[in-house]
From Swiss-Prot:
Signal peptide: none annotated. The lineage of its organism: Bacteria, Bacillati, Actinomycetota, Actinomycetes, Mycobacteriales. This is Ribonuclease P protein component. It comes from the Bacteria. GO terms for molecular function: 3'-tRNA processing endoribonuclease activity; ribonuclease P activity; tRNA binding. The gene is rnpA. PROSITE patterns: RIBONUCLEASE_P.
């Protein structure tokens, strides 16, 4: 489970991130990111917060919950990598139902990288 300080809970936080944040689409995901320091709110501290949107278009409840669990697990690994004060909303597209966890992680990391929220990983050995 994603720790409470790293979860988006309020509808207003979701809508602010989706409407005013930057967006990057991937094959099975759309990643929205918003820097809370840009908002009129005084709350710009704290770690990154993640929110998930998995609609009925993804599939029946069992599939939607499986996709949400996979994405939540990926977000736990990204908490220390995403800058503090950033809100991230991940919207699953219908293709996410058949995507593997590895594919979802690659797509999410690629989206965050394109939004300049992750440092590129060097493959020097």
């Amino acid at each position: 489970m994603l720790p409470e300080p790293h979860r988006l809970r309020r509808h207003s936080d979701f809508s602010l991130t989706v409407r005013r944040g930057r967006r990057m689409g991937r094959r099975d995901l759309v990643v929205h990111a918003f820097d809370r320091a840009q908002a009129d709110e005084l709350v710009s501290s704290g770690g990154p917060r993640f929110g998930l949107v998995v609609s009925k278009a993804v599939g029946p409840a069992v599939i939607r919950h499986r996709v949400a669990r996979r994405l939540r697990h990926i977000c736990i690994d990204l908490v220390d990598s995403v800058p503090r004060g950033t809100d991230v909303v991940i919207r699953a597209l219908p293709g996410a139902a058949t995507a593997s966890s590895r594919d979802l992680e690659k797509q999410l990391r690629a989206g965050l990288l394109r939004l300049d929220l992750l440092a590129p990983v060097s493959n020097s050995t």
